[in-house]
Amino acid sequence: MVYNNSLLVRVMDIIILYLIALITSVIVALVLKLPIIPKEKPIRFSFETSIIFPTPILALGIEAIFRNLFGDYISLAFFAGLFGALLSKYADKLFGEP
């Protein structure tokens, strides 16, 4: 079987962009002093934001939107991680508490 080499390169580029967005969001969330895990018990019913959830999920979603709208750029992956962390930190102020 012959695999298309450009497809493999494309997939690796997307994985690298996702990793950049993920790592950036975790680092920015640590700088913003978000808790690593929610402090409310039980954790599965908690609406408290943390580094584990929803910060990386928001960053990956924003990265996917940026990639489809503007193309594959490392700087956009960095900004997606930054926006994901900021959105998870200030979501209660933007949208109100649940």
Curated annotation (Swiss-Prot):
Keyword line: Cell membrane, Membrane, Transmembrane, Transmembrane helix
The source's superkingdom equals: Archaea
TM regions (residue ranges): 11-31, 46-66, 68-88
Q: Where in the cell is it found?
A: Cell membrane
Where is this protein chiefly located? membrane
Membrane topology term: Multi-pass membrane protein
Q: Which GO terms describe its cellular component?
A: plasma membrane
Q: State the oligomer form and interacting partners.
A: Putative multisubunit membrane-bound [NiFe]-hydrogenase eha is composed of at least 20 subunits.
What role does it play?
A: One of the integral membrane subunits of multisubunit membrane-bound [NiFe]-hydrogenase eha. Eha is predicted to form large electron transfer complex and might catalyze energy-driven reduction of low-potential redox carriers.
Which family does this protein fall into?
Belongs to the EhaA family.
Q: What is this protein called?
A: Probable [NiFe]-hydrogenase-type-3 Eha complex membrane subunit A
User: What is the source species?
Assistant: Methanocaldococcus jannaschii (strain ATCC 43067 / DSM 2661 / JAL-1 / JCM 10045 / NBRC 100440) (Methanococcus jannaschii)
Question: What is the phylogenetic placement of the source species in the record?
Answer: Archaea, Methanobacteriati, Methanobacteriota, Methanomada group, Methanococci
